[in-house]
Curated annotation (Swiss-Prot):
Residue ranges of domain GS catalytic in the record: 104-468
Noted pH dependence of activity: Optimum pH is 8.0 (in the presence 30 mM Mg(2+)) and 7.5 (in the presence of 3 mM Mn(2+)).
The enzyme's E.C. designation: 6.3.1.2
Cofactor note: Binds 2 Mg(2+) or Mn(2+) ions per subunit, however the activity with Mg(2+) is about 10-fold higher than with Mn(2+).
Record GO terms (molecular function): ATP binding; glutamine synthetase activity; metal ion binding
GO biological process: glutamine biosynthetic process; nitrogen utilization
Name this protein carries in UniProt: Glutamine synthetase
A single Gene Ontology CC term: membrane
Modification O-AMP-tyrosine, positions: Y397
Keyword Transport: no
Binding site for Mg(2+) 1: E129, H269, E357
Reaction catalysis annotation: L-glutamate + NH4(+) + ATP = L-glutamine + ADP + phosphate + H(+)
Amino acid sequence: MSKSVQLIKDHDVKWIDLRFTDTKGTQHHVTMPARDALEDDFFEVGKMFDGSSIAGWKGIEASDMILLPDDDTAVLDPFTEDATLILVCDIIEPSTMQGYDRDPRAIAHRAEEYLKTTGIGDTVFAGPEPEFFIFDEVKFKSDISGSMFKIYSEQGSWMSDQDIEGGNKGHRPGVKGGYFPVPPFDHDHEIRTAMCNALEEMGQTVEVHHHEVATAGQNEIGVKFNTLVKKADEVQTLKYVVHNVADAYGRTATFMPKPLYGDNGSGMHVHMSIAKDGKNTFAGEGYAGLSETALYFIGGIIKHGKALNGFTNPATNSYKRLVPGFEAPVMLAYSARNRSASIRIPYVNSPRGRRIEARFPDPAANPYLAFAALLMAGLDGIQNKIHPGDAADKNLYDLPPEEAKEIPQVCGSLKEALEELDKGRAFLTKGGVFSDDFIDAYIALKSEEEIKVRTFVHPLEYELYYSC
C-alpha cells in the first residue's frame, strides 16, 4: 500500500492537494477529491493542467502538462479544516512522458543523478538556514500616481515613542540588536514555537529556533539537513508553514532579503557535503579538517560565484542585502568559523559532520535551482581541481582597500548576476542538468523584473531631486 493511500485511510482524508514550484520559486496548487488517489493508476497518469498559465513555461499552443505526484512527499496539511493530503509533484511533458525541462524540481533531480555519474559521490546533503521577518502589517503600492511601502511592527526600534493599544511596554530589540534575546524582548517566541510544532507535525526535524539580529521581528528556524531534492521540498514546506502560522496569528511574514533599510537583511546560508558509500568525502586532513575534494568544491563555488548569484540571489532586493556592514558576505573567500567570508567551514564534533557553508544565498532563491547550481559549481571545481587558494582567516569587513580589491566579490546587482550567468553557464549544462533553453528563459523572466525596478520612479528620488 502506498504512503498516500495509507494516510488517506488512516486519517479519513477528504482532499488531496497537488503542489509544484514554478521558475521563480512560487508554489502553486490544485485540490481534488481524495478518492482519485485511490485509483490504481493515479501515480502513473497524474493530473493534467495548463502550463501556459505559469510564467516562463509553455506557450498557449502547447500548454497541456501533467502533474505527477511523488508518493514519498505525502503529508497531512495542518492548516485545513477538512483532512487534506499534500503531494509534491513533478512536471511531465505529455508528448514524451519525461520530466519537463524547465521544471525546477526536475533540474534538482538531474543534478542529483549527475553527481552519481561523476563517481565523486552518490549523495549530496543540503542544510539551508532561511531567515525571515514577521511584521504586524505591511502596506505598499506602485502605480503611476506614486509608490510607497510602510511597515508596522510593535517591536520595531522606531516604535519606542508611539501609542500602542494596551500600552507601550518598551521592550524591543534595537537596530542590529535582536540576536538571541529572551522574552519579552523576543516578541516572537510563541509564534515561532507554533511554526516549529507545525513543521514537526509535517515530518521535519526542528533543531533550533530564535530571534535574529535585525529589529522589527527577524527570525530563524533551523531544521535538520536532508538530501538535495528532499531539502528543497522541505524549504517550500517551511515557507508555507511560516506564512500560514503568521496569518493565523493575525500577522504577516516575508522572506524578502532586505525589507528594512539600515538593518541586517535575511540570508539563506546553505550547508553542503557529499557522501560516497556512506562516507563523508569532505572530511580529511587539510585546512579545518577538510579533504582535497572539499577544497576543490569550494574552489568551484568561488570561481562561479558571480554566475551562481543569478540563482542564489535572484531578486533586485537581494543586492540591497549584499553590501558591506550588515553581516552579509560579499567577499568570495573561505575560512574556518569566519562569518565575514562567503564560504565558512563550521566547527563540528565529528568528521562525519564536516561540511562547507555558502553564506551569500538568500531566501528569495528557488531552492531547487539554488541547491542544484551550487552542487554543479562545486562538482566543476572537483573535476577541474580548482583550488581556492589560501584561507582568509581575518575580518574581511575591515580590510584596507588595496587588500580588498584583490579578493573577488559577489555581484552588485541582479543585472550583473544575470549577465554573469549568461556568459558563465557552461558548468551548469554539464550532463544536461540545466539546459540552455531553461537558462535563456530564466534570464528573460528575471530581466523583466530588473528592468521594471530599474526604470520605476523611486520615492527617494523625490527627496533627492524634486527641488533641483
